[in-house]
């Protein structure tokens, strides 16, 4: 027991003692009471030292174990189809970034600058998914922000500091871990300057946001309110150094291919003028020739582009790539739905031509890989609605006609060789 009665006088009659070190309440500054135990401030401090030391050790281990670019690409290949050049650029940039952090104290006179990354590519080509997978490989906190919701401080909308707050939340409020995390800012093409001409009205969601992002991307100590900025003005702020946070920005940049195609082309007028042939290359092929000056013409300010020295362009996905995405990666959509059907003890089978038709529809919609799930949901909706109440179904087969909407899925029953085609008229 921590509470001891003594016979040395009135003072020691109800003296309390620390259950861990045995010191009395008179020998320590504070004694914290639990249901049946007490702990002194010195023991609490000792426990904190032990925890800090363990955290430091685990940090050192993670820093020393930076995966090589080849290792990173190998894991990316398991989850992301295609985009070989973009994967190579990203794996080298991420490896160098965390290698720089691992050897930060050994650099001597040479200080290595941070290389943030800009991903440019059509909608649904895998920009966001690449960033998420990278964070998982390196095992660091990751957060995603939508640039369209951001505004300058003092205006309605989200402050840029809220991005750091989300990262801190992803790190369970561990500031050390958050300071080594990855932030992905999506839709940066939507914060481009509204026009080349200076305007009387302030552009708070365009150039203003770019200006606000400059500091946190370059490196600053951000004061982050734990409960979100504007609703609780009296709360204490957490200090987060953004110097070692890796920022990855992404956007579709619709129309950027036209700016690239127009660059360097000489125009002439009159009867002797050469008729300019239309560029019939795919968007992804044109984007390979991207230069920083093209992004300036698009509407990003030079200072913002300067904070993103690594440029990686992604190609639009063709039919074959979309079929691979449907069936090959570890968490491919087909495998996900097959797992769902397995929970009902039913096997789900897709014909090859059905997958091809799904890919064609995604290309027609111009939604890339992102549109595949909505197409799959529409195809399988009725089946998933009926299946839990049907008895004896062992297999569901999806053909090209099912995807085209001219037939219902084929149900194969186990107890009899009966097939229910449900072909619609």
Swiss-Prot record:
Q: Which InterPro entries match?
A: AAA+_ATPase, ATP-dep_Clp_protease_ClpX, ATPase_AAA_core, Clp_ATPase_C, Clp_protease_ATP-bd_su_ClpX, ClpX_bact, P-loop_NTPase, Znf_CppX_C4
Q: Which organism is it from?
A: Agrobacterium fabrum (strain C58 / ATCC 33970) (Agrobacterium tumefaciens (strain C58))
For whether the record's keyword set contains Glycosyltransferase, the answer is no
Lineage of the species this protein comes from? Bacteria, Pseudomonadati, Pseudomonadota, Alphaproteobacteria, Hyphomicrobiales
Which sites bind ATP? 122-129
Give me the Gene Ontology terms describing cellular component: HslUV protease complex
**GO MF term list:** ATP binding; ATP hydrolysis activity; ATP-dependent protein folding chaperone; protein dimerization activity; unfolded protein binding; zinc ion binding
Domain of life, per UniProt, equals Bacteria
Q: Which residues form the ClpX-type ZB domain?
A: 6-59
Biological process according to GO: cell division; proteolysis involved in protein catabolic process
Kindly state which keywords UniProt assigns to this record, in alphabetical order: ATP-binding, Chaperone, Metal-binding, Nucleotide-binding, Zinc
Entry annotated with the keyword Metal-binding? yes
Short name of one Pfam family: ClpB_D2-small
Instruction: Tell me the SMART domains matching this sequence.
Output: AAA (SM00382), ClpB_D2-small (SM01086), zf-C4_ClpX (SM00994)
Entry protein name: ATP-dependent Clp protease ATP-binding subunit ClpX
Which residues does the record give as Zn(2+) binding sites? 18, 21, 40, 43
Oligomeric state and interaction partners are given as: Component of the ClpX-ClpP complex. Forms a hexameric ring that, in the presence of ATP, binds to fourteen ClpP subunits assembled into a disk-like structure with a central cavity, resembling the structure of eukaryotic proteasomes.
User: According to its UniProt record, which protein family does this protein belong to?
Assistant: Belongs to the ClpX chaperone family.
Summarize the protein's role: ATP-dependent specificity component of the Clp protease. It directs the protease to specific substrates. Can perform chaperone functions in the absence of ClpP.
